Structures are given as C-alpha cells and as structure tokens.
C-alpha cells in the first residue's frame, strides 16, 4: 500500500496547533480545512495533464490542463465533512458521495448506516476523507462499499492515523493509497489514537 506521511513544515505546524486541548471549535475547523487542502495538493500529484491552445490576451497560447480525470470526494460522516471544503478548493468540480459509518463504542466494530454514491462511480477516482484513522474499521468498511459499487481507484486522506489502523487497512486493501499528516504512536485500550486529536467530530461540530 502506498503510504505518504507529509512532513512539510506547514503541515506539521498546523497539526501541532490542532493538538492543543482547549482549541476552539472555530480554529479546529479552520485548521482541518487548511490541512485537508495541503493533503489534496500532494494526493493529486499524479493527475495527468494535457496541452491545449487557448486565446490569450495577445493571441493563441499553449496551456496545461488536467486531462479529464473524474473525481468523487467521499467524506465519511460526520467528521469527514470537516475536511471537504479544503479538498474542494483544489477540485471544485468534483462530485460528492456520502458514506455514513459509526464505530460501536463497546465492540469498536464499524456499522454502516447510510450511503449515497454518485452515478458511474466506477469511472471515477474516489478521495475518501476521514480525519482519524484509528482501528481502520471505518475506512475499511467504506472502501468495501466503494469497491462493491465498482470503484477501485481510491485514495484516503486522513489527518492522523495509528499504526494498528494502517496495518489493518493495508492487510484488507493493499491497493489503496493513504495520505496523512502524521502516523501517531498507538491506540489506547479504548481505541483512541495517542497522542491523536481527541474526538475530531466533536471538535469540528462543537458537540460532546
């Protein structure tokens, strides 16, 4: 599995700010969007471009243009919504698919409860958004669903991940790509990432 941990100073600085315990909801949202934008910049590095001729201010000009790559952005509800605006800054014409998966707090097993996928998703590259890759179960369930629908070109964008979750994802879906800001230390006995960010969904939406 292709794993890209982005160590750029801007990424690491913004991630560090997100780890502050008493960060405001507003600031957490802003940083989540900013980091997602930076992750998208790297994750789209392999998009094909073509040369086209346009009419410029002083005649015809050759320019580079992305070559018809169809993308669907797939935020995992609900925390993935906090990453969506940052991603769409770079791919504003991407179609949006929604997948809802929650993790049972006792068994830690993923439970899908909703999905709405774009048509002809088999022709698109899916960019799955989930800020926290902990046990990997939620992302694995999402990729299972996408592949069942015929989509096999899948990139996952996460802010932080635990080694255990990465290993589980790689075992089940070695053909996906993972882009993230940090591979953290471990999971605790409750399945939370250490040091992690806390509950990203609660911090994005201001709930407890």
Swiss-Prot record:
Cofactor note: Binds 1 Mg(2+) ion per subunit. The magnesium is bound as Mg-PRPP.
Catalytic reactions on record: UMP + diphosphate = 5-phospho-alpha-D-ribose 1-diphosphate + uracil
Residues the entry annotates as binding 5-phospho-alpha-D-ribose 1-diphosphate: 78, 103, 130-138, 199
Molecular function (Gene Ontology), one example: uracil phosphoribosyltransferase activity
Activity regulation description: Allosterically activated by GTP.
Superkingdom, taxonomy of origin: Bacteria
Cofactor annotation: Mg(2+)
Annotated keywords: Allosteric enzyme, Glycosyltransferase, GTP-binding, Magnesium, Nucleotide-binding, Transferase
Pfam families named in the record: UPRTase
Pathways involved: Pyrimidine metabolism; UMP biosynthesis via salvage pathway; UMP from uracil: step 1/1
Biological-process GO terms, alphabetical: UMP salvage; uracil salvage
Enzyme class: transferase
Positions that bind uracil: 193, 198-200
Family classification: Belongs to the UPRTase family.
Function: Catalyzes the conversion of uracil and 5-phospho-alpha-D-ribose 1-diphosphate (PRPP) to UMP and diphosphate.
Protein name: Uracil phosphoribosyltransferase
Species name: Blochmanniella floridana
Gene that specifies this protein: upp
């Amino acid at each position: 599995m292709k794993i890209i941990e982005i160590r750029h100073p801007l990424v690491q600085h913004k991630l560090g700010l997100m780890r502050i315990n008493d960060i405001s909801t507003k600031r957490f949202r802003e940083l989540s969007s900013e980091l997602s934008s930076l992750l998208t910049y790297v994750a789209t590095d392999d998009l094909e471009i073509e040369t086209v001729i346009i009419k410029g201010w002083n005649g015809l000009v050759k320019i580079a243009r992305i070559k018809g790559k169809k993308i669907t952005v797939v935020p995992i509800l609900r925390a993935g919504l906090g990453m969506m605006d940052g991603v769409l800054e770079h791919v504003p014409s991407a179609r949006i698919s929604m997948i809802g998966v929650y993790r049972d707090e006792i068994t830690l097993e993923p439970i899908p409860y909703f999905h709405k996928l774009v048509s002809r998703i088999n022709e698109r590259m899916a960019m799955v958004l989930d800020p926290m890759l902990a046990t990997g179960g939620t992302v694995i369930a999402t990729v299972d669903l996408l592949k069942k629908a015929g989509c096999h070109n899948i990139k996952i964008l996460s802010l932080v991940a635990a080694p255990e979750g990465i290993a589980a994802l790689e075992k089940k879906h070695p053909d996906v790509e993972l882009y993230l800001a940090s591979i953290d230390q471990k999971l605790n006995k409750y399945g939370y990432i250490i040091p992690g960010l806390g509950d990203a969904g609660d911090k994005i939406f201001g709930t407890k």
